[in-house]
UniProtKB/Swiss-Prot annotation:
Residues reported to bind Mn(2+) 3: Q822, E834
Pathway(s) the chain acts in: Amino-acid biosynthesis; L-arginine biosynthesis; carbamoyl phosphate from bicarbonate: step 1/1; Pyrimidine metabolism; UMP biosynthesis via de novo pathway; (S)-dihydroorotate from bicarbonate: step 1/3
Entry EC no(s): 6.3.4.16, 6.3.5.5
Gene3D superfamilies, alphabetized: 3.40.50.20, ATP-grasp fold, A domain, ATP-grasp fold, B domain, Carbamoyl-phosphate synthetase, large subunit oligomerisation domain, Methylglyoxal synthase-like domain
Name used for this protein in its record: Carbamoyl phosphate synthase large chain
């Protein structure tokens, strides 16, 4: 079937902000979908609330709406645009749920809009747990014994009949939110209660647990002619019981027999045919390893996280093909876009092994519950490709970037075998390292299999890695050089081989060089070399044949940003992608190195050449030595890329833009402090300390409160405001490792307005596209603050000072390209908080709201131009006639035992933007886009305010009462408010907890004296609010801003939704 000519205009719904369970993979799939439809001459309209995405760039769709993903907003956009169809399968669960709500409310019928690729009936059959179960039984596909429950009593009856454990899966939720495995009646009641509340339709599936069975996924495509193919099948290393997003995954599956593979393949094709899905679909199975029994776990009737992984693993652009199918094409009419020589009907063939490892946020949250279950906790993932499992696994582990060297965690070296086996029983993020350590201690595969139920094939692979370690350590080894070569080919890093053998790294490198041990580069071409590929991508391997054609063209390498994590999100992938595009425009060949399967940067057609590799110095240098580029850009890939600057510099690599010396100066506390003194720019009083005694002395001189943090951080990790000696002592012993190499920085905490300045510099002149002001005062991490463009309260003399200081710093640091500076204004002086000589997380939003292509201009400077040639002027650009408000989004409900208070440690996983020509409406849109309900008629508000904020909170609480809120309070706050004439009811903690659980509290304002202290009353209240999705503000500035949103709602102000182009007319 050719293109459907009746489709003239299509609305694509994005996925909104990044959060746990829904991250960059939907920017990748949404961008592909927009491009695929647009190139058919169909008008594309995109709605998405996430300004950090490539898909919200003005050229990706004909019209781009950065507006809240709410029924109200999208209905108004449909009314205005009148699309013929909607693509809802490329924006994750958010888009699917929104499309279903619009369908059920009659909006799609009213405006004669079709759901393309998947109809509402298929969505219901896949997403509604009861309908799904009924369909599977109808087509004779096995599902576990289960019931659909909407009340706790039904759950208890089921367990009384069939026993524990059971798995609880809420309907229409994301990343397993609200679900879990219950092994006791107490757990059953708690998880079921939470799951029913978190499901948008109040429904959960309760099913008999098959924990311990193998978990497998099949990525399937189907068209309207009923052509079906399997793109890729994947196997979770962890058995059923761990969410697939939290599991180590291999592609293709490694342990299935041919019979098992085809049995599940047949089932997957039968399911997609009966659901009548046209496009992509992900089907998850559980397989009993002791028999041929299997069950169908669930179906995602859309492009998913696993689709992104399958796309990159197989080299098959699932989202692009699915979008083409949705507008009428069939698989046999489409080409494979990687080979351009074969049909999209051919199933990809993989002659390599792919390993995905999740990236968890536990390095930031040391109090978090690390147990992995059916509710996803990972923020991102890495993918590695090699010719065998062992090499791919070691490459993936290296890609995680933490303080990890091979399959080793230092802390396990001091544990007993019994402790290790106890640790291995529990499914958590460290289990694979505990397994490796158990093998080092002589525990055998059989014993570990009994404890973990991980297939012996995988355990044998891990054991072979440990055997290699033992061979390297063997004092009687007569041919150590041979063992070193063997280890390198297996995937060991030079640093790890040096550590194991106690030899210098230089000596190891020499042995490898003398023996000409260098990697070759193999292609991902979807067809195991059967057809010639036009746009393949590459991975390294220690084999003989090199499939990589290196040209003499002038080329530039961009270092990617690695896995999505808190503090380094999709914004940096945005910068890398724009960097690659600008390099092409400047007449160079673009090369990107990255390891994140979720992103646009690792799409097959983004750069001229993609290397899917670990961002470890060994791997990066192998590519640079092979390609011999004109230079390397590190300023777009966040702290990951910046951290490579030192090693690249020492290896003689030319870093384009700001020099390594300047990067180091900005990061080095003492050197930078001296520079500020020379430039006469005020800074908060601070010191670097390397011992407890020095810390006490420093605080004596500076005075409490202080901000403490390690040097070289990302996202404010292990950063805290400290108010007294006890808190300082606790921080120094628990949060950081003190040493002369890693000093701790202690700064005076200055309370004031925080300001963000992003600038482009050519070494002489600067261009500041806009100045952004934070709503929350200092002490809250910039990534967690509500941020306004343009600035709202700053006097002209302060703005002049900001421009002057920024110019001085750019010149002194000889910045070429992008730089971000954070300032604080305390009402009298402007102080520099920090300087980042690189792209920041505000570059995408600032580029969009000012119309200045910041990354493109930076690349033009890096390739020889200056600002005056580029046509955007110099110094501070005049503000556009619009207001933009960036609102952070958190995944608090996903991470048990983590405090939600806002402080200097970044916690948000994503962001949204509210944009309007009216400032108050922009704030309203921002809160709505962040998923926060804005009530018109008040509700029940609980307040508990720390002493220093009490007086300031009075007019704010009074305003809430005027807006119809009944006030409940803690004892201390209640007494204070009553004295101020505010009517309130004091609630004991137990009563409050019950009220939150019963849904009787709508909003909480709780400014903690000391956040992050597990076990306190405030911590318990904040956690309960997170788990039951009750809005909680921990900063009174946020609570004050929310009043503005309520005001807009109460006044029924006319809220208009505009395409971005309308603001630039």
């Amino acid at each position: 079937m050719p293109l459907d000519k009746t489709i003239k205009k299509v609305l694509i719904i994005g996925s909104g902000p990044n959060n746990i369970g829904q991250a960059a993979e939907f920017d990748y799939s949404g961008t592909q979908a927009c491009k695929a439809v647009k190139e058919e001459g169909i008008e594309t309209v995109l709605v998405n609330s996430n300004p950090a995405t490539i898909m919200t760039d003005s050229h990706i769709a004909d019209k781009v709406y950065i507006e809240p993903l709410t029924e109200e907003a999208v209905e108004k956009i449909i009314e205005k645009e009148r699309p013929d169809g909607i693509l809802a399968g490329f924006g994750g669960q958010t888009a699917l749920n929104l499309a279903m709500n619009l369908n059920d409310a009659g909006v799609l019928d009213k405006y004669n809009v079709r759901l393309l690729g998947i109809n509402s009936e298929a969505i219901k059959k896949a997403e509604d747990r009861e309908e799904f179960k009924n369909l599977m039984e109808e087509i004779d596909e096995p599902v576990p014994k289960s019931i659909i429950a909407t009340h706790i009593d039904e759950c208890i009856d089921f367990v009384n009949k069939f026993g524990l454990p059971v798995i609880i899966r809420p309907a229409f939720t994301l990343g397993g939110t609200g679900g879990g495995i219950a092994s006791t009646m107490e757990e059953l009641k708690e998880i079921c209660d939470r799951g029913i509340k978190m499901s948008p339709i109040g429904q959960i599936l309760l099913e008999q647990s098959v924990a311990g069975w193998k978990e497998l996924e099949y990525e399937v495509m189907r068209d309207a002619k009923d052509n079906c193919i399997i793109v890729c099948n994947m196997e979770n290393l962890d058995p059923v019981g761990v969410h697939t997003g939290d599991s180590i995954v291999t592609a293709p599956s490694q342990t299935l027999t041919d019979k098992e593979y085809h049995m599940l393949r047949h089932s997957a094709l039968k399911i997609i045919r009966n659901l009548k899905i046209e496009g992509g679909c992900n089907i998850q199975f559980a397989l009993n390893p002791k028999s041929n029994d299997y069950i169908v776990i669930e179906v995602n009737p859309r492009v998913s996280r696993s689709s992104a992984l399958a796309s990159k693993a197989a080299g098959y652009p699932i989202a692009k093909i699915a979008a083409k199918i949705a507008v009428g094409y069939s698989l046999d009419e489409l080409k494979n876009y990687v080979t351009k020589n074969s049909s999209a009907c051919f199933e990809p063939a993989l002659d390599y092994v792919v390993v995905k490892i999740p990236k968890w946020p536990f390095d930031k949250f040391n109090t978090a519950e690390r147990h992995l279950g059916t509710q996803m906790k990972a923020t991102g993932e890495v993918m590695a490709i090699d010719r065998d499992f062992e090499s791919a696994l070691l490459k993936a582990v290296t890609s995680l970037e933490g303080k990890i060297s091979g399959l080793r965690l230092e802390k396990f070296e001091y544990t007993t075998v019994r402790e290790l086996l106890e640790k291995i029983k529990k499914q958590d993020d460290e289990r694979i390292f505990a397994i490796a350590e158990a093998f080092r201690r002589g525990v055998d595969v059989k014993q570990i299999h009994e404890v973990t139920e991980i297939d012996n094939w995988y355990l044998n692979g891990i054991n072979r890695i440990i055997d290699m370690e033992k061979e390297l350590q063997d004092k009687n080894n007569k041919d150590k050089d041979k063992s070193i070569i063997k280890a390198k080919k297996m995937g060991f890093t030079v640093a790890e081989i040096a550590r194991i053998t106690s030899l210098e790294e230089g000596k190891i490198k020499n042995i490898l060089n003398v023996n000409n041990v260098k990697p070759v580069f193999k292609m991902v071409d979807t067809c195991s070399g059967e057809f010639e590929a036009e746009t393949p991508y590459y991975y390294s391997s220690y084999e003989n044949e090199d499939e990589n054609e290196v040209t003499d063209d002038k080329k530039i390498v961009v270092i990617g940003s690695g896995p999505i994590r808190i503090g380094q999100g999709i914004e940096f992938d945005y910068c890398c992608v724009h960097g690659v595009w600008a390099i092409k425009e400047a007449g160079y060949k673009s090369i990107i190195i990255n390891n994140n399967p979720e992103t646009v940067s690792t799409d097959f057609d983004t750069a001229d050449k993609l290397y899917f590799e670990s961002l470890y110095i060994d791997n990066v240098m192998n590519i640079i030595e092979k390609e011999k580029p004109e230079g390397v850009i590190v300023q777009f890939g966040g702290q990951t890329a910046i951290n490579l600057a030192d090693k690249l510099y020492k290896n003689g690599v030319k870093i384009l833009g700001t020099s390594f010396e300047s990067i180091d100066l900005a990061e080095d506390r003492e050197k930078f402090s001296e520079l500020l003194k020379e430039l006469n720019i005020p800074q908060a009083k601070g010191m670097a300390v390397t011992s407890m005694e020095e810390a006490y002395e420093a605080v004596k001189e500076i005075g409490y409160p202080v901000i403490v943090r390690p040097s070289y951080v990302i996202g404010g990790r292990a950063m805290q405001v400290v108010y007294d000696k006890l808190a300082l002592q606790k921080y120094m012993t628990e949060a950081v490792t003190l040493s002369t190499e890693h000093p701790v920085l202690i700064d005076k905490y200055i309370k004031g307005t925080e300001i963000e300045v992003d600038t482009i510099s050519d070494g002489e002149n600067i261009l500041i596209p806009g100045i952004m002001e934070h709503i929350e005062r200092t002490g809250v991490h910039s990534g967690d603050s509500i941020t306004m463009y343009p600035y709202h309260t700053l006097p002209k003399e302060v703005v002049d000072k900001l421009v002057k200081y920024t110019k001085s710093l750019a010149k002194a640091l000889e910045v070429k390209g992008l730089m971000n500076i954070q300032y604080v204004y305390d009402g009298e002086n402007v102080y520099v908080i920090e300087v980042n000589p690189r792209a920041s997380r505000t570059v995408p939003i600032l580029s969009k709201v000012t119309g200045v292509p910041m990354v493109k201009l930076a690349v033009e400077i890096l390739t020889g131009k200056n600002l005056k040639e580029l046509g955007y002027g110099v110094d501070l650009k005049k503000d556009n006639k619009l207001y933009a408000v960036k609102v952070p989004v958190f995944s608090n409900e996903k991470l048990a035992n983590v405090d939600i208070y806002l402080g200097p440690e970044m916690r948000s996983t994503g962001e949204v933007m509210g944009i309007d020509s009216d400032f108050e409406v922009a704030i309203y849109k921002g809160f709505r886009a962040a998923g926060i309900e804005v009530p018109k008629d008040g509700g029940n508000l609980y307040v508990s305010i720390k002493d220093v904020d009490k007086q300031e909170s009075v007019p704010i609480i009074k305003k809430y009462t005027e807006f119809g809120y009944k006030i409940y309070a803690s004892l201390g706050t209640g007494k204070f408010l009553q004295k101020q004439g505010i009517d309130c009811e004091v609630l004991r903690t137990d009563d409050l907890m019950k009220a939150i659980g019963d849904g009787k509290i709508n909003l909480i304002i709780n400014s903690p004296t000391r956040g992050n202290t597990v076990g306190t009353r405030g911590f318990s209240i904040r956690r309960k609010a997170a788990e039951y999705k009750v809005g909680a503000f921990t900063c009174i500035d946020t609570a004050k801003a929310f009043l503005t949103a309520i005001k807009v709602k109460r006044e029924e102000a006319k809220v208009e939704y505009r395409a971005m182009k309308e603001y630039f007319k």
